[in-house]
Amino acid sequence: MKLFVYHTPELTPTDHLPDCAVVIDVLRATTTIATALEAGAEAVQTFRDIDQLMETSDRWLPEKRIRAGERGGAKVEGFDLGNSPLDCTPEQMGGKRLFLTTTNGTRALQRVEKSPTVITAAIINRQATVNYLLDRQPETVWLVGSGWEGGYSLEDTVCAGAIAQSLVTALVQGIGMGNDEVTAAIALYSQFQNNLLQLFHQSSHGQRLLRLNCDEDLKYCAQPDLLGVLPIQKEPSVLVKFC
């Protein structure tokens, strides 16, 4: 297995794709996706464009859909939910499709959607991600951070480092570092693995969410291995629970 870390979707190569792309948006899209599927959503369908989301979701019965999204961390006006994973309860999600648009995570998903396998990862489902990669052993793996509007983010990098460190520990000689970003991500995780919430508070997007009174979201997003669910792309932009 050869492992690569890319801090934003814009930094990924444009002339080829990996065997498996792992999209990371810890604050908060991939945390929300995992939580929604664990809570019983039949699928999560992601969109970059709000108008496209509205057009597609209009084809679904109101009782079978939930529209969720944020721009700049704040809920999109007229939507059912924002992008808080804490809103993804079984009562809200059960048997419904979540139509989701976010500032960063949905852009990253679109960038790699043509890869043979696309999964999403966050701190809360790190071990499920690692288990899948160890079981399937894809030849090339990209860990793609969503960043913030094209820029680097601490929280996505530390999650990539958590996944990479577990893979390196398990595979020892059976893994190759595809770029220096892998080593840097592991180093960041090694430094903050016992205090992820502190790191999130220091990150620019974490501070943005704190200003929006999303303290509880940060606490939730910082809990390692809380869920055993693995979101996997069934078709472009549509994620389901891997079984």
UniProtKB/Swiss-Prot annotation:
- Give TM segment ranges: none
SUPFAM superfamilies assigned to the protein according to its UniProt record, in alphabetical order: ComB-like
EC class of this enzyme?
hydrolase
Q: What cofactor(s) does the depicted protein rely on?
A: Mg(2+)
Q: Which UniProt keywords apply?
A: Hydrolase, Magnesium
Gene3D superfamilies cross-referenced by the UniProt entry: ComB-like
According to its UniProt record, which reaction does this protein catalyse?
Answer: (2R)-O-phospho-3-sulfolactate + H2O = (2R)-3-sulfolactate + phosphate
- Cite the EC number: 3.1.3.71
Name any one Pfam family assigned in the record: 2-ph_phosp
Which molecular function terms from Gene Ontology are attached?
2-phosphosulfolactate phosphatase activity; magnesium ion binding; sulfopyruvate decarboxylase activity
NCBIfam families the UniProt entry points to: PRK00886.1-5
Q: Quote the PANTHER family the UniProt record gives.
A: 2-PHOSPHOSULFOLACTATE PHOSPHATASE-RELATED
Entry similarity comment: Belongs to the ComB family.
What name has this protein been given in UniProt?
Probable 2-phosphosulfolactate phosphatase
Source organism (scientific name): Rippkaea orientalis (strain PCC 8801 / RF-1) (Cyanothece sp. (strain PCC 8801))
| The gene coding this protein | comB
